[in-house]
Structure formats: C-alpha cells, structure tokens
Amino acid sequence: GEGGAYTKYFFPEQLTFNNYKRLFTETTLLNFPRAFMNTLIISIFSCMISTTFVLSVSYCMSRLRFKMRKPFMNLAMILGLFPAFMSMVAVYFILKAIGLTEGSGLRLALILIYSAGSGTGFYIAKGFFDTVPKSMSEAAILDGCNQFQVFYRIILPLSKPIVVYTILTAFLAPWLDFVFVRVIVGPKDKYWTVSLLLYNMLEKEFVNGWFTR
C-alpha cells in the first residue's frame, strides 16, 4: 500500500494482521514490547496504590466522624475542579530535586504521580458506601470487630461494583495518560509508555516505516 501517515483511501485495500506481528518483533527503530511492559508495570502498581487509597479514604469519610471531616471533603471537591496537568511543572521540579527524573527512577516517578492525588477522588465510592446500612457495621463492632475488619469483611464484599469501578479507573488513567509522560520522560525512549511511543511514530524518521505499509 501507500507509505506515509496519509492515504487517498479510507478503507484498507487488503486485510492483514502482519502489522501486529511487526509491532512486537521489529524493535530496531521503536521498541513496542518495552513500551508495553513499561505501561503495564506503571499501570498495575498505580492501580494497586490508588485503589487502596481511594477505598480507604472513602470508608473513613463515610463511616467515621472527626473534626476536620467536612473541611477536608470541601477541599477535595475544590481541588477536583482543577485539572491535574496544571501542576505538572511544579511536580517535575520536585521530582528532579529528589532525583527521580533520570534512569529507573522515572517509572517510580510516574507511579507516584498517578497515585499521589488519588485519595481525593473518593466521592463516588463514599456515596456507594453510604448506601450500606450502618446497622451492619454497628452489629459487627458489637461482636468484637475493629474498623479494619468491618471495612475488609463487611463493607468491601457488599461493595463489589464500586470496587471494580475503582480498579478499572485507577488502571486506565495511567494507561491512557500522555501529558505527564511527555513532560517527565521526554526523549528517554527506554522509559516510553505506549501513548508516548505512538506519538513518536508520527515523527518523520518513523512515519514511513509504520503507517499504511
């Protein structure tokens, strides 16, 4: 077929799966398997940390009563009005100051970025936890359960839909992100994720080798 990113036709002239094979076997110019593994590692660890933070904070806001509860909830709502990338310049310099913008620290830096503010996104899970009858928690406490046991053995099993939703969103956010990866990783192709690698496929030295071939 025609080479390049743009062609004269909309539908492909022939059906082939060779490009999927090439994507994982031809690594001389762009190493897709490495980018895929980088993305998978970052997404899995970010998902684990974020899910733990979100569900824990949601339970605290739903079931516990403490002095700064309302101000914290209001602050979290206000912070949620601003997109995360507004802070990326400050975040970059903080990471640079602690040495996480070079080498293997880049993966850790991205995991920290995606996980750090996840706890403020607790409103949806909190709303679901609010629907679980408090009488069940109170009965468990009377039977000798502590707060962790109530959370782990009663609330979570009754909240499987919101747990699955939290896991999916916590995984997809780093998997699909481009802006922070572009700023933090930059030209260091060893630590590219899939989104950054796909973006670089459009560079003039790569475009003819990957599109409509």
What is the role of each PLM region?
Residues 1-213:
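A structural signal for multi-pass alpha-helical bundles of membrane permease subunits
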